[in-house]
Protein backbone atom coordinates (compact mmCIF):
# COMPACT_ATOMS: atom_id res chain seq x y z
CA UNK A 1 0.00 0.00 0.00
CA UNK A 2 1.34 3.38 -0.84
CA UNK A 3 0.82 6.48 1.20
CA UNK A 4 -1.05 8.40 -1.48
CA UNK A 5 -4.79 8.74 -1.29
CA UNK A 6 -7.10 7.77 -4.11
CA UNK A 7 -7.71 11.46 -4.87
CA UNK A 8 -4.08 11.83 -5.89
CA UNK A 9 -4.57 9.28 -8.66
CA UNK A 10 -7.70 10.76 -10.19
CA UNK A 11 -5.80 11.87 -13.33
CA UNK A 12 -6.00 9.98 -16.61
CA UNK A 13 -2.27 10.08 -17.47
CA UNK A 14 -0.76 6.60 -17.38
CA UNK A 15 2.58 5.61 -15.90
CA UNK A 16 3.58 4.29 -19.31
CA UNK A 17 3.18 7.78 -20.80
CA UNK A 18 5.44 9.20 -18.10
CA UNK A 19 8.14 6.61 -18.85
CA UNK A 20 7.79 7.18 -22.60
CA UNK A 21 8.35 10.90 -22.07
CA UNK A 22 11.52 10.28 -20.07
CA UNK A 23 12.78 7.85 -22.72
CA UNK A 24 12.14 10.40 -25.48
CA UNK A 25 14.10 13.07 -23.60
CA UNK A 26 17.03 10.70 -23.06
CA UNK A 27 17.09 9.88 -26.77
CA UNK A 28 17.06 13.58 -27.61
CA UNK A 29 20.02 14.25 -25.28
CA UNK A 30 21.93 11.37 -26.86
CA UNK A 31 21.25 12.72 -30.36
CA UNK A 32 22.39 16.22 -29.42
CA UNK A 33 25.70 14.87 -28.10
CA UNK A 34 26.12 12.66 -31.18
CA UNK A 35 25.54 15.57 -33.57
CA UNK A 36 27.99 17.76 -31.63
CA UNK A 37 30.67 15.05 -31.76
CA UNK A 38 30.23 14.53 -35.52
CA UNK A 39 30.44 18.27 -36.20
CA UNK A 40 33.64 18.51 -34.17
CA UNK A 41 35.10 15.54 -36.06
CA UNK A 42 34.14 17.06 -39.41
CA UNK A 43 35.76 20.38 -38.46
CA UNK A 44 38.95 18.60 -37.45
CA UNK A 45 39.00 16.67 -40.74
CA UNK A 46 38.60 19.85 -42.81
CA UNK A 47 41.45 21.54 -40.92
CA UNK A 48 43.65 18.49 -41.51
CA UNK A 49 43.41 18.81 -45.30
CA UNK A 50 46.45 20.42 -46.89
CA UNK A 51 44.88 23.62 -48.20
CA UNK A 52 46.05 25.86 -50.99
CA UNK A 53 46.14 29.63 -50.51
CA UNK A 54 42.75 30.50 -52.14
CA UNK A 55 40.94 28.02 -49.86
CA UNK A 56 42.36 29.17 -46.53
CA UNK A 57 39.76 31.89 -45.88
CA UNK A 58 36.91 29.69 -47.13
CA UNK A 59 37.75 26.71 -44.93
CA UNK A 60 38.27 29.00 -41.94
CA UNK A 61 34.78 30.47 -42.39
CA UNK A 62 33.25 27.00 -42.83
CA UNK A 63 34.93 25.73 -39.67
CA UNK A 64 33.59 28.70 -37.69
CA UNK A 65 30.04 27.95 -38.87
CA UNK A 66 30.39 24.26 -38.01
CA UNK A 67 31.67 24.98 -34.51
CA UNK A 68 28.76 27.37 -33.90
CA UNK A 69 26.38 24.52 -34.73
CA UNK A 70 28.41 22.26 -32.46
CA UNK A 71 28.03 24.76 -29.61
CA UNK A 72 24.25 24.91 -30.06
CA UNK A 73 23.95 21.11 -29.87
CA UNK A 74 25.98 21.04 -26.66
CA UNK A 75 23.86 23.80 -25.12
CA UNK A 76 20.69 21.90 -26.05
CA UNK A 77 21.93 18.68 -24.43
CA UNK A 78 22.78 20.53 -21.19
CA UNK A 79 19.38 22.26 -21.14
CA UNK A 80 17.43 19.01 -21.67
CA UNK A 81 19.49 17.28 -19.00
CA UNK A 82 18.96 19.98 -16.36
CA UNK A 83 15.49 21.41 -17.01
CA UNK A 84 13.68 18.44 -18.55
CA UNK A 85 15.15 15.09 -17.50
CA UNK A 86 16.49 15.85 -14.00
CA UNK A 87 13.32 17.77 -13.22
CA UNK A 88 11.23 14.62 -13.84
CA UNK A 89 13.59 12.01 -12.39
CA UNK A 90 12.18 12.10 -8.85
CA UNK A 91 8.59 11.74 -10.01
CA UNK A 92 9.34 8.95 -12.49
CA UNK A 93 11.20 6.91 -9.85
CA UNK A 94 8.37 7.36 -7.37
CA UNK A 95 5.63 6.32 -9.80
CA UNK A 96 7.57 3.26 -10.95
CA UNK A 97 8.12 2.27 -7.32
CA UNK A 98 4.40 2.02 -6.54
CA UNK A 99 3.49 0.52 -9.96
CA UNK A 100 0.16 2.32 -10.33
CA UNK A 101 -1.63 2.50 -13.67
CA UNK A 102 -2.09 6.26 -13.41
CA UNK A 103 0.17 8.94 -12.01
CA UNK A 104 -0.55 11.36 -9.19
CA UNK A 105 -1.60 14.95 -9.68
CA UNK A 106 1.81 16.20 -8.51
CA UNK A 107 3.54 13.97 -11.07
CA UNK A 108 1.13 15.13 -13.75
CA UNK A 109 1.91 18.76 -12.93
CA UNK A 110 5.64 17.99 -13.05
CA UNK A 111 5.15 16.26 -16.40
CA UNK A 112 3.38 19.30 -17.82
CA UNK A 113 6.16 21.59 -16.54
CA UNK A 114 8.81 19.35 -18.07
CA UNK A 115 6.99 19.35 -21.40
CA UNK A 116 6.64 23.12 -21.23
CA UNK A 117 10.38 23.55 -20.62
CA UNK A 118 11.08 21.28 -23.57
CA UNK A 119 8.77 23.24 -25.86
CA UNK A 120 10.08 26.61 -24.68
CA UNK A 121 13.56 25.63 -25.87
CA UNK A 122 12.61 23.81 -29.06
CA UNK A 123 9.88 26.09 -30.42
CA UNK A 124 8.60 29.05 -28.41
CA UNK A 125 5.49 29.36 -30.60
CA UNK A 126 3.97 26.33 -28.87
CA UNK A 127 4.23 28.02 -25.51
CA UNK A 128 1.23 30.20 -26.33
CA UNK A 129 -0.86 27.10 -27.07
CA UNK A 130 -0.24 25.40 -23.73
CA UNK A 131 -2.95 25.73 -21.10
CA UNK A 132 -3.50 24.62 -17.53
CA UNK A 133 -3.41 20.78 -17.36
CA UNK A 134 -6.72 19.60 -18.75
CA UNK A 135 -8.18 16.64 -20.57
CA UNK A 136 -6.59 17.73 -23.85
CA UNK A 137 -3.18 17.96 -22.14
CA UNK A 138 -3.59 14.41 -20.84
CA UNK A 139 -4.34 13.20 -24.35
CA UNK A 140 -1.16 14.94 -25.50
CA UNK A 141 0.90 13.18 -22.83
CA UNK A 142 -0.59 9.78 -23.69
CA UNK A 143 0.26 10.34 -27.36
CA UNK A 144 4.00 10.49 -26.60
CA UNK A 145 4.44 6.81 -27.54
CA UNK A 146 3.55 7.69 -31.15
CA UNK A 147 6.71 7.94 -33.27
CA UNK A 148 5.10 9.40 -36.43
CA UNK A 149 3.10 12.62 -36.86
CA UNK A 150 -0.39 12.06 -35.53
CA UNK A 151 -3.44 13.05 -37.51
CA UNK A 152 -5.22 16.13 -36.34
CA UNK A 153 -8.03 15.31 -33.94
CA UNK A 154 -11.11 17.40 -34.23
CA UNK A 155 -11.65 17.16 -30.50
CA UNK A 156 -8.24 18.62 -29.62
CA UNK A 157 -7.83 22.32 -30.12
CA UNK A 158 -4.00 22.37 -29.96
CA UNK A 159 -2.63 18.92 -30.93
CA UNK A 160 1.13 18.41 -30.36
CA UNK A 161 2.65 15.03 -31.26
CA UNK A 162 5.92 13.55 -30.08
CA UNK A 163 7.30 13.90 -33.60
CA UNK A 164 6.64 17.65 -33.73
CA UNK A 165 8.10 18.13 -30.25
CA UNK A 166 11.32 16.38 -31.19
CA UNK A 167 11.93 17.95 -34.62
CA UNK A 168 10.24 21.36 -34.39
CA UNK A 169 13.41 23.44 -34.02
CA UNK A 170 15.90 21.30 -35.99
CA UNK A 171 15.26 23.18 -39.23
CA UNK A 172 16.96 26.32 -37.97
CA UNK A 173 20.15 24.53 -36.96
CA UNK A 174 20.13 22.34 -40.06
CA UNK A 175 19.74 25.37 -42.30
CA UNK A 176 22.78 26.98 -40.69
CA UNK A 177 24.75 23.76 -41.11
CA UNK A 178 23.63 23.41 -44.74
CA UNK A 179 24.77 26.94 -45.53
CA UNK A 180 28.21 26.20 -44.10
CA UNK A 181 28.63 22.96 -46.03
CA UNK A 182 27.25 24.50 -49.21
CA UNK A 183 30.22 26.88 -49.20
CA UNK A 184 32.43 23.87 -49.84
CA UNK A 185 30.14 22.19 -52.37
CA UNK A 186 29.40 25.29 -54.48
CA UNK A 187 32.75 27.08 -54.20
CA UNK A 188 34.57 27.40 -57.54
CA UNK A 189 37.87 26.89 -55.73
CA UNK A 190 36.71 23.46 -54.56
CA UNK A 191 35.70 22.54 -58.10
CA UNK A 192 39.12 23.57 -59.44
CA UNK A 193 41.39 22.14 -56.78
CA UNK A 194 39.31 19.17 -55.62
CA UNK A 195 37.37 17.92 -58.69
CA UNK A 196 36.91 14.51 -57.08
CA UNK A 197 34.59 16.16 -54.56
CA UNK A 198 31.93 16.60 -57.25
CA UNK A 199 32.41 13.04 -58.59
CA UNK A 200 31.66 11.11 -55.45
CA UNK A 201 30.46 7.59 -56.20
CA UNK A 202 27.69 7.59 -53.63
CA UNK A 203 26.13 10.75 -55.13
CA UNK A 204 25.28 12.21 -51.73
CA UNK A 205 26.13 15.80 -50.87
CA UNK A 206 26.80 16.95 -47.36
CA UNK A 207 23.90 19.40 -47.30
CA UNK A 208 21.45 16.53 -47.80
CA UNK A 209 22.13 15.17 -44.32
CA UNK A 210 19.28 16.81 -42.47
CA UNK A 211 20.23 15.97 -38.91
CA UNK A 212 22.91 13.29 -39.16
CA UNK A 213 26.32 14.45 -40.38
CA UNK A 214 27.94 11.73 -42.46
CA UNK A 215 31.70 11.35 -42.67
CA UNK A 216 33.37 12.94 -45.67
CA UNK A 217 35.10 10.27 -47.70
CA UNK A 218 37.18 12.80 -49.62
CA UNK A 219 39.18 13.76 -46.55
CA UNK A 220 42.63 12.28 -46.81
CA UNK A 221 44.94 11.46 -43.97
CA UNK A 222 47.63 14.03 -43.21
CA UNK A 223 50.89 13.63 -45.02
CA UNK A 224 53.32 11.63 -42.92
CA UNK A 225 56.06 13.82 -41.45
CA UNK A 226 58.44 10.96 -40.70
CA UNK A 227 61.69 11.38 -42.62
CA UNK A 228 62.60 8.82 -45.23
CA UNK A 229 66.14 7.51 -45.40
CA UNK A 230 67.86 8.05 -48.71
CA UNK A 231 70.46 5.69 -50.11
CA UNK A 232 73.94 7.11 -49.48
CA UNK A 233 75.44 8.48 -52.67
CA UNK A 234 78.80 9.92 -53.60
CA UNK A 235 79.37 13.05 -55.56
CA UNK A 236 82.63 14.55 -56.86
CA UNK A 237 81.56 17.84 -55.27
CA UNK A 238 81.22 16.39 -51.76
CA UNK A 239 84.26 14.07 -51.97
CA UNK A 240 87.85 15.19 -51.59
CA UNK A 241 89.52 12.01 -52.87
CA UNK A 242 89.11 10.12 -56.14
CA UNK A 243 90.63 6.86 -54.89
CA UNK A 244 88.05 4.40 -53.64
CA UNK A 245 88.40 0.85 -52.39
CA UNK A 246 85.85 -1.50 -53.88
CA UNK A 247 83.12 -2.15 -51.29
CA UNK A 248 82.60 -5.82 -50.48
CA UNK A 249 78.84 -5.78 -50.92
CA UNK A 250 77.06 -7.91 -53.53
CA UNK A 251 75.32 -5.91 -56.22
CA UNK A 252 76.86 -2.57 -55.21
CA UNK A 253 77.24 0.00 -57.99
CA UNK A 254 79.55 2.98 -58.41
CA UNK A 255 79.08 6.16 -60.46
CA UNK A 256 79.33 5.58 -64.16
CA UNK A 257 82.36 7.86 -64.58
CA UNK A 258 84.53 5.46 -62.55
CA UNK A 259 85.62 2.14 -64.04
CA UNK A 260 87.00 -0.20 -61.40
CA UNK A 261 88.94 -3.44 -61.97
CA UNK A 262 87.88 -6.78 -60.63
CA UNK A 263 88.07 -7.49 -56.92
CA UNK A 264 91.43 -8.57 -55.56
CA UNK A 265 92.25 -10.14 -52.25
CA UNK A 266 93.60 -7.74 -49.67
CA UNK A 267 94.34 -7.74 -45.98
CA UNK A 268 93.31 -4.09 -45.82
CA UNK A 269 89.92 -3.24 -44.39
CA UNK A 270 87.99 -1.25 -47.04
CA UNK A 271 87.10 2.34 -46.27
CA UNK A 272 83.43 3.22 -46.08
CA UNK A 273 82.28 5.98 -48.34
CA UNK A 274 81.00 9.09 -46.64
CA UNK A 275 77.20 9.38 -46.98
CA UNK A 276 75.87 12.63 -48.35
CA UNK A 277 73.80 14.85 -46.08
CA UNK A 278 70.13 13.91 -46.16
CA UNK A 279 68.14 17.04 -47.00
CA UNK A 280 64.78 15.59 -45.98
CA UNK A 281 65.87 14.39 -42.53
CA UNK A 282 64.78 17.31 -40.35
CA UNK A 283 65.66 15.57 -37.10
CA UNK A 284 69.35 15.33 -38.03
CA UNK A 285 69.43 18.97 -39.13
CA UNK A 286 68.02 20.35 -35.88
CA UNK A 287 71.39 19.93 -34.15
CA UNK A 288 74.15 22.42 -34.68
CA UNK A 289 76.85 19.76 -34.72
CA UNK A 290 76.17 17.30 -37.51
CA UNK A 291 77.73 13.85 -37.13
CA UNK A 292 81.07 13.49 -38.89
CA UNK A 293 81.80 10.01 -40.17
CA UNK A 294 85.53 9.26 -40.01
CA UNK A 295 87.07 6.34 -41.96
CA UNK A 296 88.27 3.50 -39.79
CA UNK A 297 91.97 2.67 -40.03
CA UNK A 298 92.99 -0.88 -40.86
CA UNK A 299 93.83 -3.00 -37.82
CA UNK A 300 96.26 -5.87 -38.33
CA UNK A 301 96.91 -8.79 -35.95
CA UNK A 302 99.98 -8.85 -33.76
CA UNK A 303 103.20 -10.16 -35.29
CA UNK A 304 103.28 -13.68 -33.78
CA UNK A 305 103.77 -15.74 -36.95
CA UNK A 306 106.77 -18.01 -37.43
CA UNK A 307 109.65 -17.24 -39.75
CA UNK A 308 108.60 -19.95 -42.23
CA UNK A 309 105.12 -18.51 -42.40
CA UNK A 310 106.47 -15.06 -43.09
CA UNK A 311 108.65 -16.36 -45.91
CA UNK A 312 105.76 -18.17 -47.60
CA UNK A 313 103.25 -15.33 -47.18
CA UNK A 314 103.06 -13.08 -50.24
CA UNK A 315 103.30 -9.35 -49.76
CA UNK A 316 99.93 -7.57 -49.34
CA UNK A 317 98.52 -6.00 -52.45
CA UNK A 318 96.52 -2.81 -52.13
CA UNK A 319 93.31 -2.77 -54.13
CA UNK A 320 93.66 0.73 -55.56
CA UNK A 321 91.56 1.07 -58.72
CA UNK A 322 92.92 2.72 -61.80
CA UNK A 323 90.80 5.26 -63.62
CA UNK A 324 90.55 4.34 -67.26
CA UNK A 325 88.36 7.36 -67.96
CA UNK A 326 89.46 10.04 -65.49
CA UNK A 327 86.98 12.83 -64.81
CA UNK A 328 88.10 16.41 -65.25
CA UNK A 329 86.86 18.28 -62.18
CA UNK A 330 87.30 21.62 -63.88
CA UNK A 331 84.91 20.57 -66.64
CA UNK A 332 82.47 19.29 -64.02
CA UNK A 333 82.50 22.56 -62.09
CA UNK A 334 82.17 24.52 -65.33
CA UNK A 335 79.06 22.57 -66.27
CA UNK A 336 77.62 23.11 -62.79
CA UNK A 337 78.27 26.84 -63.05
CA UNK A 338 76.36 26.96 -66.32
CA UNK A 339 73.57 24.88 -64.83
CA UNK A 340 73.06 27.09 -61.77
CA UNK A 341 73.36 30.24 -63.89
CA UNK A 342 69.94 29.40 -65.35
CA UNK A 343 68.46 29.51 -61.80
CA UNK A 344 66.84 26.06 -61.79
CA UNK A 345 64.42 24.96 -59.07
CA UNK A 346 66.11 21.60 -58.44
CA UNK A 347 69.69 20.42 -58.11
CA UNK A 348 71.27 18.01 -60.62
CA UNK A 349 70.64 15.28 -58.03
CA UNK A 350 66.92 16.08 -57.97
CA UNK A 351 66.69 17.92 -54.63
CA UNK A 352 64.48 21.04 -54.49
CA UNK A 353 66.04 24.51 -54.34
CA UNK A 354 64.06 26.75 -51.98
CA UNK A 355 65.80 30.07 -52.68
CA UNK A 356 68.82 31.86 -54.11
CA UNK A 357 70.65 34.10 -51.62
CA UNK A 358 73.65 36.45 -51.59
CA UNK A 359 76.24 36.64 -48.82
CA UNK A 360 76.35 40.06 -47.12
CA UNK A 361 79.30 39.25 -44.87
CA UNK A 362 82.24 36.89 -44.90
CA UNK A 363 82.05 33.84 -42.66
CA UNK A 364 84.73 31.33 -41.71
CA UNK A 365 83.51 27.82 -40.97
CA UNK A 366 84.19 26.60 -37.44
CA UNK A 367 82.89 23.05 -37.93
CA UNK A 368 83.42 20.52 -40.72
CA UNK A 369 79.67 20.61 -41.41
CA UNK A 370 79.79 24.36 -42.17
CA UNK A 371 80.97 26.16 -45.30
CA UNK A 372 82.93 29.39 -45.81
CA UNK A 373 81.23 32.50 -47.16
CA UNK A 374 82.72 35.43 -49.01
CA UNK A 375 80.99 38.73 -49.63
CA UNK A 376 78.71 38.64 -52.72
CA UNK A 377 78.82 34.84 -52.98
CA UNK A 378 75.64 33.39 -54.49
CA UNK A 379 74.21 30.34 -52.74
CA UNK A 380 71.26 28.00 -53.19
CA UNK A 381 69.20 27.09 -50.11
CA UNK A 382 68.44 23.37 -49.80
CA UNK A 383 66.96 23.42 -46.30
CA UNK A 384 65.82 26.06 -43.81
CA UNK A 385 66.30 25.08 -40.19
CA UNK A 386 64.46 26.63 -37.27
CA UNK A 387 67.68 27.36 -35.36
CA UNK A 388 68.83 29.81 -38.05
CA UNK A 389 71.45 27.57 -39.66
CA UNK A 390 70.51 26.90 -43.28
CA UNK A 391 71.83 24.23 -45.58
CA UNK A 392 73.06 24.94 -49.10
CA UNK A 393 76.09 25.47 -51.30
CA UNK A 394 77.89 28.28 -53.08
CA UNK A 395 77.14 28.31 -56.82
CA UNK A 396 78.86 31.55 -57.82
CA UNK A 397 81.62 32.62 -58.49
CA UNK A 398 82.53 28.94 -58.01
CA UNK A 399 80.68 25.80 -57.04
CA UNK A 400 81.44 24.58 -53.54
CA UNK A 401 80.34 21.75 -51.32
CA UNK A 402 77.09 21.39 -49.39
CA UNK A 403 77.12 22.63 -45.80
CA UNK A 404 75.56 24.86 -43.16
CA UNK A 405 75.78 28.65 -43.01
CA UNK A 406 74.18 31.36 -40.79
CA UNK A 407 70.98 32.76 -42.26
CA UNK A 408 71.61 36.25 -40.82
CA UNK A 409 74.65 36.62 -43.06
CA UNK A 410 72.69 36.50 -46.32
CA UNK A 411 69.86 38.20 -48.18
CA UNK A 412 67.37 36.48 -50.47
CA UNK A 413 67.49 37.16 -54.20
CA UNK A 414 64.55 37.34 -56.58
CA UNK A 415 64.73 35.79 -60.02
UniProtKB/Swiss-Prot annotation:
Domain SH3: start-end pairs: 352-415
Listed under GO biological process in this entry are: ubiquitin-dependent protein catabolic process
Which GO terms fall under molecular function for this chain's record? peptidase inhibitor activity
- GO cellular component term of the entry, any: endosome
Is the keyword Phosphoprotein assigned to this protein? yes
This protein's major location comes to cytoplasm
Sorted alphabetically, the keyword list is:
Cytoplasm, Endosome, Phosphoprotein, SH3 domain, Ubl conjugation pathway
Compartments annotated for it: namely: Cytoplasm; Endosome
Q: Which residues carry this modification: Phosphoserine?
A: 221, 226, 235
- InterPro entries xref list: AH/BAR_dom_sf, SH3-like_dom_sf, SH3_domain
Q: Which residues carry this modification: Phosphothreonine?
A: 231
Keyword ATP-binding on entry = no
In terms of Gene3D superfamilies, this protein maps to: Arfaptin homology (AH) domain/BAR domain, SH3 Domains
Functional note: Required for the regulation of activity and recruitment of ubp4 to endosomes.
Assembly and oligomerization = Interacts with ubp4.
Identification of the protein by name: Ubp4-interactor sfp47
Q: Which organism is it from?
A: Schizosaccharomyces pombe (strain 972 / ATCC 24843) (Fission yeast)
Gene this chain is encoded by:
sfp47
Amino acid sequence: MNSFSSNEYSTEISTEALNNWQQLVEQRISLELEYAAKLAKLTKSIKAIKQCAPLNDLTKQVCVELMQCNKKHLEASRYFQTHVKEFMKEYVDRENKFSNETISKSSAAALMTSMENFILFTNPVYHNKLQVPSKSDMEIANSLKITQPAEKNSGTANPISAYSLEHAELDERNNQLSEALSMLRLSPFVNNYYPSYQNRKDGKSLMENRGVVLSVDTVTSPISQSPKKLTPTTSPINSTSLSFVDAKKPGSKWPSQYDFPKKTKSTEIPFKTLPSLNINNERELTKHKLPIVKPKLAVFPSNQATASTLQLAPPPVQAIPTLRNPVNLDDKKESLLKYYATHPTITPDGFPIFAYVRALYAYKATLPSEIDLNVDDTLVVLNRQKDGWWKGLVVSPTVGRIGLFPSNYIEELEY
